[in-house]
A protein has these predicted regions:
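Short beta-strand element of the alpha/beta-hydrolase
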Residues: 55-64
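The alpha/beta-hydrolase serine catalytic core
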Residues: 43, 145, 152, 157-288
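Alpha/beta-hydrolase active-site loop
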Residues: 107-128
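Glycine-rich nucleophile elbow surrounding the catalytic serine of serine-hydrolase chemistry
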Residues: 139-149
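N-terminal cap/lid segment of alpha/beta-hydrolase-fold proteins
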Residues: 25-54, 275
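Conserved alpha/beta-hydrolase
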Residues: 80-102
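Alpha/beta-hydrolase fold nucleophile elbow
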Residues: 129-141
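The serine-hydrolase catalytic nucleophile loop
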Residues: 68-80, 95, 240-241
Length: 290
């Protein structure tokens, strides 16, 4: 299938298609209080804390493979605005080696991404303006896997979780998408350069071997808070909606199949209906559960 784990890394295509981001950006207000921060491990993030007389809930947002913190079509930027309108803060980060964060892409691993997420979590927990007892976490595709692993390793940290376009076994899906040939090349040479069609990426063997560092079937049940999973009907991640909903341990659980949507909710088309529906449903979910 097309448009899976790395498809929403088409931010460059989005910029070209929309001539300076007119479609995505014109619909999204620039929120006061949004600042770019650098965490202790060199991870860069964008913090959005709406004005409030009391500490606000907040959502940690984790991007997918070969993407960055604003996500394709600025979906995370737009979601941050929607959350702020509901009185919810957010922190979206670039994983080490991606976006503006420090580090070498070729040294990127699943374990490293989880570590980055944990540093971001600790930062949110330390903020006076954020209610550390009302934190949520969201992941998009590979970021969804990192979300599952982060929450599984920190089961008491998050009150609510949402997944976008998230699969199950990471090794299986990456073999299908990146091919066994690239797995073998990385094992033989230490790194492999892959042309994704819109950008080049250089991955180290540690990325491929690290896909088995965590088991989603083991980690996911550790999380016991509220849970929502979202997928487009035209994407393979829809096959996992039932599994995630049925294995969620919290009292409040939901799945949302977006009819006609692909892996990135058709955000690179002129019609933003499905992308906006996904953003609204997610913002409403966190407003209800945080």
């Amino acid at each position: 299938m097309k448009l899976r784990l790395f498809a929403f890394a088409l931010t460059l295509v989005c910029l070209l298609s929309f001539a300076g981001m007119t479609v995505a950006q014109d619909a999204v207000p620039v929120n006061e209080g949004e600042t770019v921060i650098t965490l202790e491990n060199g991870v860069v993030g964008t913090l959005n804390v709406p004005e409030s007389d009391s500490p606000v809930p907040a959502v940690l947002m984790l991007h997918g493979f070969a993407s960055s913190r604003n996500e394709v079509g600025d979906m995370y930027l737009r979601l941050a605005a929607a959350l702020a309108e509901r009185g919810i803060g957010s922190l979206r980060i670039d994983f080490s080696g991606w976006g503006e964060s420090a580090g070498d892409m070729a040294e990127s691993t699943v374990s490293g991404m989880v570590a980055d997420a944990e540093v971001a979590l600790q930062y949110l927990q330390s903020l006076d303006g954020v209610d550390a007892s009302r934190l949520g976490i969201l992941g998009f595709s590979l970021g969804g896997g990192i979300t599952v692993f982060t929450a599984g390793e920190n089961p008491d940290a998050f009150k609510s979780m949402a997944l976008w376009s998230t699969f199950g076994n990471l090794r299986d899906i990456f073999i299908e998408e990146l091919t066994q040939e690239n797995f073998d090349a990385a094992a033989a040479n230490g790194t492999v350069e892959i042309d994704l069609g819109w950008r080049m990426v250089t991955l180290g063997n540690g990325f491929f071997t690290g896909l088995e560092d965590f088991d989603y079937q083991t980690e996911f049940p550790n999380y016991t808070g509220s849970f929502m999973v979202v997928a487009g009907s035209e994407d393979g991640s829809a096959d996992f909606l039932d599994w995630y909903r049925e294995h969620a341990q919290g009292a409040l659980r939901a799945s949302y199949l977006v009819p006609g949507a692909d892996h990135i909710y058709n955000v690179l088309t002129e019609d933003q209906t499905l992308a906006e529906a996904t953003i609204k449903a997610t913002a409403d979910w966190f407003a209800m559960t945080l």
